[in-house]
């Protein structure tokens, strides 16, 4: 068990001799930096290891940019207008952060290869009020898409009108595969930005929240030397150091990237039947009817369902009446407003496969009822 990886009789010193019970070590113990770097596909010198939540790091990055600016640029809070690009459907908690700071959010359509890069380039390269973009590049939330090599390279080669434009690269599902033989891979955005002469343009985030424990994992940020130095100026005021015992616990338990991957195979064995239960019902009951579309992801934590336009809220409401609680329709869009009222995020992780199949049966029944009502109303 992970909780037994360290105990009262353990040597509680990091590999460099740091006593993990003490204060200090702002950016994480060396072995934890190595573990997170390997997980994220980068190198330890790009890493700061924080506490348990990558969302906390993302919030801090936006907050810091808002109050103190990035690398000497004007703090966003002093500007008349700040905009963020939001690939949709996307992660509601990303959108909640930017909405909290009063940042204007712009929808960017997604495809199986990633965001519409023509739109991204048009906005980023020509509008200096565009300061960032939210990205879940691998097994995206909620669609399960992985950005293509071309998409990653186009991101790295952006020519932002704003010097302080940043890509918020939330690599939440970087090792969260569902299958051993069908796994998506993605280019390392850090090295691609370096090759393109844009080393400072990206903040990458990841955590072990869906690897070890949701509230007790470790989280990390990867970025350039200049960005890390800038962040540490504030971080040294904010904290004396994060939970090094938890960092040590994770390294002692997983040991290395191979240990992480082997552990995630066990997760996949639990998750895969749940996803397949939903997909089987969707394919059997809705396949070929033209009243919904979905994608079979190879990893991540969600299935994205697109109903007929104008039907999502009613489908979710009918499901709730019948005892199946879904994520609110519209949650996958900024401000909770899906322009087409069609996207529904399905999260299969919690119920058993049998419960999931039963819930999926009810879901497709509601889809059919609402769709028929919609068609008859025309």
Describe each region flagged by the PLM:
Residues 315-321, 359-364:
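Short amphipathic alpha-helices in soluble, non-transmembrane regions
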Residues 132, 166, 203:
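Hydrophobic "anchor" residues on beta-strands that sit immediately upstream
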Residues 1-12, 236, 242, 252-254, ...:
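N-terminal basic, amphipathic alpha-helical segments
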Residues 10-163, 174-197, 312, 364-377:
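Conserved core of the PLP fold type I
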Residues 304-309, 326-366:
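Conserved PLP-binding active-site segment of the aspartate aminotransferase-like
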Residues 265-279, 291-306:
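Conserved glycine-rich beta-strand-loop-beta hairpin in the small C-terminal domain of fold type I
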Residues 50, 191-272, 372:
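Conserved core segment of the aminotransferase class I/II
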